[in-house]
Structure formats: structure tokens, C-alpha cells
């Protein structure tokens, strides 16, 4: 999977990595920054998604589409698609450009809007990556977990870097008898929940 990533995808990943690094240094306002995952987290997510059961693959928080590309690599390998949600119009526009430039539009379905308004229509969720504003994590968790297939995965970003802000949701997940959960120290910390 990693050895067969198309050059246009790798080029776009590098381009987005450069923008993200610049955003972190030049004082770009927080909501305008890409705030994307590091590449090792992307690889980790792709491996998890590639081993999830057959079902829906969704992402909550697209930004410019960097993490989506990693998930799309896994989905393309398996002949699946991913649906990703982005609430900010300017980031959705950049994500559309990402998927067009990389020719991943056939694998990725971008929905512009609040994921919480759309998640009810998804059953049979095999994999969900949650990387949105921290105040929506707990609500998204409670919507997604009942929709996960047995063996399905919910992965939430920033479980270590934003541990205090996410504490109620993290505590809930780690004690939730519907899932096996742990925090993995990859990137900014990934909460990984597997539906029992």
C-alpha cells in the first residue's frame, strides 16, 4: 500500500506538509491553519483502515484533505470509498482541490457541513477518524459508537496533546463497555476504540 502511493498524491502530501509547517510558524489564525496530522499518524491510520471490517469509512474534520489522502490510500487498495466531512467552507474548497489534483475524487466523497447533522444516516461504520474541534468530540463519539460494526474502529486525534480538553470523552471511551479502547502515543496521541 505505501509502496504504491501515486506520485501526484505524494506531491500533494508534501505540499500540504509545507503549508502546515508554515502556518505553525507565521502566526496564521488558529481556525485558518491546516492543523493536520503528522505523516506517521497518517500511516498508522491507513494501516488501521486497511484492516477494518467491510463497511463505511468516514472522517470527521477534513481540513485540506491530508489525513483523508492517507485513508483514501487504504480505501483505494481495498476497492472502498471514504466519506469526509468539513464544516469550514475555505477548508472544504482546499480539500476539493486536493482530491481533484490527486485524482482521488473517485475514492473520496466530501460533504461540506457539520458531520453531526449527517452521521445518523450511516449504519455499518467500519472505520471513523475524528479530528475536529475538540468541543464536538464527545457528541460525535456518542453518535458513532452505536453505528460501528463489530470490530469497527473509531480513532480520535489529539488524545495526548489535548488530553485535558478531551478528558470527559477519553474517560468515557476508556470505561465504555461497548468498546476496547486505548491511547496510542503516535503523533499527537490517538484514542483507538474497537467495537466489541
Question: Where on the chain are the PLM-derived regions?
Answer:
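A short alpha-helical cap/connector motif
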Residues: 1-127, 134-155, 159-196
